[in-house]
């Protein structure tokens, strides 16, 4: 199972991605969680300590590694489009609570048509994770839709779009569904977060097709408290973990995932 979790900034996608990863790891399944967000904080949500996280350099920032694998140098305009990457998750990933974390980062100067060495490297790594790893792979994507335009997540089993009860968030889901279709990804599901009341629930149900809605997560200050204390929501909030467990069960029931 290979899932890309996406959504607008601040909607709670990292909390969802990290807790989902912890739930699969608790079952004894091999889990790889890849942080593809420039504001990398998936590690904290997984339960890593700050000292370990401070020692991690995103793959996209490892200039020597990128040069070594792609052959790209300052004076060389040519580089390999198919670099060796199959050893990178095990060599550079860090493990905590049964989850292997791989911090990929992003190519800040990317854009829709970027074919720079760093982008080639990241796309190859994600492609390897999606097509060749036997692990449960959960990608915590950068906020927005740029990664869809670059085709970075091509080949995943599904996109899970985390949204809030609001028109702009719903529009993000619609845009992801349209762009995912262009990448050949048929499964686009929704998790509604920060739901406060019946009015919010009705708003979500009236705008998201029932077959696409995996579930709702209710607004919970324990998530904020966990973040303040640098703890994983999985370890801090039984309520949040229970709600995401129900969503996970629905994911598991879907044979296409």
Where are the model-predicted features located?
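Phosphate-binding/switch loop-helix module in NTP-utilizing enzymes
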Residues: 75-143
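N-terminal phosphate/diphosphate-binding loop that engages ATP/GTP or pyrophosphate donors
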Residues: 23-97
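C-terminal boundary of histidine-terminating zinc-finger modules
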Residues: 227-239
């Amino acid at each position: 199972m290979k899932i890309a979790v996406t959504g607008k900034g601040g909607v709670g996608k990292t909390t969802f991605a990290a807790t989902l990863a912890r739930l699969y790891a608790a079952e004894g399944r091999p889990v790889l969680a890849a942080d593809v967000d420039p504001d990398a904080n998936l590690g904290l949500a997984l339960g890593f300590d700050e000292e370990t996280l401070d020692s991690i350099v995103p793959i996209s920032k490892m200039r020597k590694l990128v040069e070594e694998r792609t052959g790209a140098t300052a004076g060389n305009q040519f580089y390999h489009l198919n670099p060796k990457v199959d050893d990178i998750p095990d060599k550079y990933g860090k493990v905590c609570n049964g989850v292997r974390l791989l911090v990929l980062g992003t190519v800040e100067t990317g854009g829709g048509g970027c074919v720079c060495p760093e982008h080639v490297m990241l796309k190859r790594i994600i492609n390897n994770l999606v097509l060749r790893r036997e692990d449960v792979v959960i990608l915590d994507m950068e906020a927005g839709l740029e990664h869809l335009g670059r085709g970075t997540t091509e080949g995943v089993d599904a996109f899970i779009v985390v949204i809030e009860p609001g028109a702009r968030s719903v529009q993000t889901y619609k845009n992801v569904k349209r762009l995912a279709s262009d990448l050949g990804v048929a499964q686009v599901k929704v998790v509604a977060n920060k739901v406060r009341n019946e009015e919010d629930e009705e708003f979500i149900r009236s705008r998201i097709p029932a077959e696409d809605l995996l579930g709702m997560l209710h607004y919970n200050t324990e998530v904020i408290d966990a973040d303040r204390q640098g703890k994983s929501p999985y370890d801090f909030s039984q309520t949040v973990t229970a709600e995401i467990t129900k969503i996970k069960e629905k994911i598991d029931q879907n044979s296409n995932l």
